[in-house]
Amino acid sequence: MLSYQDKAGAFYKDNARANSTKLSLVTEEHGGRRPPYLLFVLLVLLVGILALLAITGVRFHQVSTSNMEFSRLLKEDMEKSEAVHHQVIDVLTPLFKIIGDEIGSRLPQKLNEIKQFILQKTNFFNPNREFDFRDLHWCINPPSKVKVNFTNYCESIGIRKAIASAANPILLSALPGGRSDIFPPHRCSGATTSVGKVFPLSVSLSMSLISRTSEIINMLTAISDGVYGKTYLLAPDDIEREFDTQEIRVFEIGFIKRWLNDMPSLQTTNYMVLPENSKAKVCTIAVGELTLASLCVEESTVLLYHDSSGSQDGILVVTLGIFGTTPMDHIEEVIPVAHPSMEKIHITNHRGFIKDSIATWMVPALASEKQEEQKGCLESACQRKPYPMCNQTSWEPFGGRQLPSYGRLTLPLDASVDLQLNISFTYGPVILNGDGMDYYESPLLNSGWLTIPPKNGTILGLINKAGRGDQFTVIPHVLTFAPMESSGNCYLPIQTSQIIDRDVLIESNLVVLPTQSFRYVIATYDISRSDHAIVYYVYDPIRTISYTHPFRLTTKGRPDFLRIECFVWDDNLWCHQFYRFEANIANSTTSVENLVRIRFSCNRSNP
């Protein structure tokens, strides 16, 4: 007997086989016939293939036709280009050669003939008198029977252009980097170090004179765009054999050239020697545009007369070109032209510059106009706070109770006009030190930096912005303040105290560097250590930082003169320094002139 499960399994297995057999029979039955829709699909596929073949054939034909057309056009263009090339070679090149020959040889000859014709006609109509081109009003309305002669003027202009052309290669080697910054970049996060070195002057005229035991009493130096100028009083030992006086005035000018190891060297190219007379005892200096200019007087204080009652003293004008024996070497005495309210000017050690053929200096001046305004500024400031200057009863450099003003001296150097010294004045921050004003060129077009040196360690000096244009203004820049008690345009210089620093025997002039960013330098003769030293202070007011570097001296003495002039060379600070001192042991006066270099570097920089 089979169990229930065996029966059930047998039943389902048999049933499954029966069903499978039945299905296979059905499939074989349907496989013998094809449905009509399958034939329709095959027909559509055949038609599509034929259509694609037809489209491909048409596109291939079009591409072949386009390629043939492009080849034909390209061949035509190449034939035309070849024809143009032959036309240029065969026709235009000989034509250009003919034109060049005509312009190079015939045109100058024709122009010379026209020039000679004009000169002949001019000489014919103006037969009697020579004409000085510097009288410009004669050009506009010339007098009758005046012979026009442009020879002197044209020669002067031609010489200036030739000198500029000859000097340009020398200046190009010196100018790169002349206005770059000397300080480490802002990203410097470590300590800033300075390294200094002293270099002797080897090819300068003054150094050759000093080496012959001649004594230089004082020296002014100015440097501008690769050119330097000097003036100084010289007392050589053998002067009795050459001049009747005990001192001679020397002017020299030259280039700053690259020397060994790319260091700067002051090479003299032209100089002038004058016997020290009544007009060359005190001289200023200005350098620029390959020219040196100087104003010389007998006494520092020059009285200005505006009527016939007084005899106006003249001022000696000296100009010197970069190369010798040229019209720029000139000596002439001129009568200054000043504002009627001006009474005096005070000329001492003044450094100016030449720009647009105009030499400009700044000097202390005394004017009667607007005195009450200046006095009111000081009185209002002193009412509530006793500033050290409030107790002054005499004002430098003229003395008395009148406050000095700022005077501007301008001297046009254009060959087309006569030499004329113009003096104007204006007021600005109160002047406490009347010994010297310097004027430095500014990147701004119509202004410069006017500096007044410090004094006795109590007066820090002044740096103002002074205009060069018709409107002469002096605007405070640094080292001044506006008292709260005063109103209007009232500024006072910073005065620390009345206690004199005994360790600082003398302070130099205040120098503004020719960098794009505002920087200034000052030097002092310091005896605070066992070795005497000249200490340089370099200031960056924008970043409110300053750096110092001392140069130790091998000698000791009491200095009576210290003057510096600084410039930038290969991103380093270079300064020409001249100082005189009386030796403690020998009791003799010694003059020292040299170059110093200060290199600033950063120990660590941020990336």
Swiss-Prot record:
Glycan-carrying positions: 149, 391, 422, 456, 587, 603
Highest taxon of source: Viruses
Membrane-protein topology: Single-pass type II membrane protein
Keyword set, alphabetical order: Glycoprotein, Hemagglutinin, Host cell membrane, Host membrane, Host-virus interaction, Membrane, Signal-anchor, Transmembrane, Transmembrane helix, Viral attachment to host cell, Viral envelope protein, Virion, Virus entry into host cell
Intervals, Intravirion compartment: 1-37
A biological process term (GO) from this entry: virion attachment to host cell
Virion surface topological segments: 59-607
Protein name as it appears in the record: Hemagglutinin glycoprotein
One GO location term (cellular component): membrane
Transmembrane feature ranges: 38-58
Family of this protein: Belongs to the paramyxoviruses hemagglutinin-neuraminidase family. Non-sialidase subfamily.
Species name: Canine distemper virus (strain Convac vaccine)
The keyword Glycoprotein is annotated on this UniProt entry: yes
Function of the protein: Attaches the virus to cell receptors and thereby initiating infection. Binding of H protein to the receptor induces a conformational change that allows the F protein to trigger virion/cell membranes fusion. The cellular receptor might be SLAM, and may explain the lymphotropism of the virus.
Subunit structure: Binds canine SLAMF1 at the cell surface.
Compartments in which it is found: Virion membrane; Host cell membrane
One of the record's GO molecular function terms: host cell surface receptor binding
Lineage: Viruses, Riboviria, Orthornavirae, Negarnaviricota, Haploviricotina
Pfam family, one: HN
